[in-house]
Amino acid sequence: MSDYLSVSALTKYIKYKFDQDPHLQSVLIKGELSNFKKHSSGHLYFNVKDKESVISAMMFKGSASKLNFEPKEGDEVLLEARVSVFERRGNYQIYVNKMQLDGIGNLYQKLEALKKKLTEEGCFDKANKKSIPKFPKKIAVLTASTGAAIRDIHSTINSRFPLAEQIQISTLVQGEKAKDDIIEKIEYADSLGVDTIIVGRGGGSIEDLWNFNEEAVVRAIYNCKTPIISAVGHETDFTLSDFAADIRAATPTQAAVIATPDQYELLQQIQQYQFTLTRFIKKHLEQQRKHVEHLSSYYKFKKPTLLYDQQIQRRDDLEKRLKQQIQATFEQQRHRLMLLQQRYNLKALLSSVNQEQQNNLQLTNQLVKLLNSKILSYKNDLKNKVENLNNLSPTNTMLRGYAIVNKKDEVITSTKDLTENDQLTLTMKDGLVDAKVTKVRCNND
């Protein structure tokens, strides 16, 4: 019986063999998480599987606290672990020291972390977005020199707004060198003084589009002074460049639509503006014509002297009052001098008095010149107004051989208002003439 081993002894021996094998102390394993559970103690229990096999695994709380993501059922992971035996059950399992997402999962993890960082910095804030010019003169297009994206953008801009100059900047959009090339081309386009920049490429996997998730590329777009339209991938594709750009387009074609106005819509707007302006001008001219006709019927325009008689009288009155004021001032000064002569020695003050007289004389001359200048200005102004009013006077019009035609006390301005045998009164410069219409001839007859 001494040759038989107990279950515990065999299990301990197998565990000892596992623990002494250096190849099992640090193994790298790739697989999918299943039956994932997080214990209240903080330890993680799960299986790692592929298409053919399953291994039990656990991760102690200390190692689990160092993870930079939350593991979940179905995650594809890369593990660093040691292999040992769980004695109580007698099965082998792995004890995981490190865990990270594999492939695309890792990319999404990096993407979310960078998105959170840039969001906190304000790189995606709407307040920092620049408006896209409505009527661009120059548009820089950053994309691959071949492919559907550049063709779609080029044809759409040409059909919508051919006045815009397109500056095509061939750019690497995929591969190891694409990141630096995209940054360089964005900075170059920003230095050209264009109105809008379109950064775009066709669709692809997250790996294909990853250059537009690179932090340096996103910051180059955010720091660009020229408005940028991002058109990376298809409608369902999103990159961090879309969030940093001033506006995101679902496709390269939509980017061209956003960047340009439609020439046919503009033509319709111009035609509408032209119609509205023409209607306004016609209405304004008609209002002014009626206003002139209304003014011409005023009594004062028939007797223009009524407009300036009172002004002439007022000017004469002001002239008279000014002269009286000057004379009164002069008399006051003369009387003052006489009093001074009586109080002081005339000889001692003669020099001062002469100077005062010269000052008064100079002042008087200046006042007289000023008065004459003002009077002349008023006369010229009134003369111009009289001439303008006389030019508008019906009397002066009649002096040039014209006559005012009246029928039953109404002024006739058109042959359409006359018929044969109408009795008319013609007002001429020196009297009235009664007349009778024998025949009416219109200019278009």
Swiss-Prot record:
Name of this protein: Exodeoxyribonuclease 7 large subunit
Its EC number(s): 3.1.11.6
Subunit structure, as described in the record: Heterooligomer composed of large and small subunits.
NCBIfam families: xseA
Function: Bidirectionally degrades single-stranded DNA into large acid-insoluble oligonucleotides, which are then degraded further into small acid-soluble oligonucleotides.
Catalytic class of the enzyme: hydrolase
Family classification: Belongs to the XseA family.
GO cellular component: cytoplasm; exodeoxyribonuclease VII complex
Compartments in which it is found: Cytoplasm
Catalytic activity entry: Exonucleolytic cleavage in either 5'- to 3'- or 3'- to 5'-direction to yield nucleoside 5'-phosphates
A biological-process GO annotation: DNA catabolic process
Keyword set includes Cytoplasm: yes
Keyword tags: Cytoplasm, Exonuclease, Hydrolase, Nuclease
Molecular function, one GO term: exodeoxyribonuclease VII activity
Gene that produces this protein: xseA
Methyltransferase found in the keyword field: no
Chief localisation class: cytoplasm
